[in-house]
Amino acid sequence: MIQKSRPALLQHQDVGDRVETLMLQPVIKAFLCGSISGTCSTLLFQPLDLLKTRLQTLQPSAHGSRRVGMLALLLNVVRTESPLGLWKGMSPSIVRCVPGVGIYFGTLYSLKQYFLRGHPPTALESIILGAGSRSVAGVCMSPITVIKTRYESGRYGYESVYAALRSICHSEGFRGLFSGLTATLLRDAPFSGIYLMFYSQTKNVVLHRTDQLDAVLVPVVNFSCGIFAGILASLVTQPADVIKTHMQLFPMKFRWIGQSVTLIFKDYGLRGFFQGSVPRALRRTLMAAMAWTVYEEMMAKMGLKS
């Protein structure tokens, strides 16, 4: 009996050793650090994402009527749906952001190790690395992004993530899960590239001019550089975000990017491409700044260079 059980025990130990070895891989550590940082930022800033989606999909106001602002919309959501209504769509957001941010940071770490081999990236290299990493994450998480957008809009009554997947596949086919993917990549890839470029270059300038920076101030510097980079990147990519939202919510009407641009301009004018810019800039800036700050701190604790 003892001799028969030993191979199974040894096999179990081998599997355990493989799992332990895998968890020690730097790329896996980068993925885990990114996932944890994504969880923190998503939980805190989900209300801003919901307000952004609602503002972008408001019906055009009649001539002379007062436009609905972010504060008025926030109060309306709290009044009609309760304060927890601000966290509507939390489940798909977590499902998307946690692995999505992990995939982004894991891919970024791998690309840095392969192409840069330890030297800091130039401005152009930062743009390429950030855009490439975000594109990989965007394609992987596109189905969840579609579901998240529809959850937050309040126009769909999905009972669960599985019910949403089944409904979309039944009514729109598998292709429906990738509605607005091109617009998403046109928004996210430039955002991540521009963000990483501003973030890394700004941080290099600050750290270069400061010979000895107190360790306590390092997260503050990282967060401040993240805020600056996020604001600039958000403004540049706002029109693509509006187009993406309309294509994901109304795929039968907004079928391709050129048509979407024409329809949005016809209904809302040039201002329509910047609807929801305030909550989006706040959310993207704060989320990215927090994600990078938490990520870099965790990577430093693990003895890895981010």
UniProtKB/Swiss-Prot annotation:
Reactions the enzyme catalyzes: glycine(in) = glycine(out)
InterPro entries: Hem25/SLC25A38, Mitochondrial_sb/sol_carrier, Mt_carrier_dom_sf
Cysteines joined through disulfide linkages: none
Residue ranges of Solcar repeats: 25-114, 121-205, 217-301
MF terms in GO: glycine transmembrane transporter activity
Topology relative to the membrane: Multi-pass membrane protein
Coiled-coil stretches: none
Highest rank taxon of the organism: Eukaryota
Compartment(s) of residence: Mitochondrion inner membrane
UniProt xrefs under PROSITE patterns: SOLCAR
UniProt entry tagged with the keyword Transport: yes
Keywords assigned by UniProt, alphabetized: Membrane, Mitochondrion, Mitochondrion inner membrane, Repeat, Transmembrane, Transmembrane helix, Transport
Listed transmembrane segments: 31-56, 89-115, 127-152, 180-203, 221-247, 276-294
GO biological process, one term: glycine import into mitochondrion
Family label: Belongs to the mitochondrial carrier (TC 2.A.29) family. SLC25A38 subfamily.
Job description of the protein: Mitochondrial glycine transporter that imports glycine into the mitochondrial matrix. Plays an important role in providing glycine for the first enzymatic step in heme biosynthesis, the condensation of glycine with succinyl-CoA to produce 5-aminolevulinate (ALA) in the mitochondrial matrix. Required during erythropoiesis.
Annotated protein name in UniProt: Mitochondrial glycine transporter
Organism: Bos taurus (Bovine)
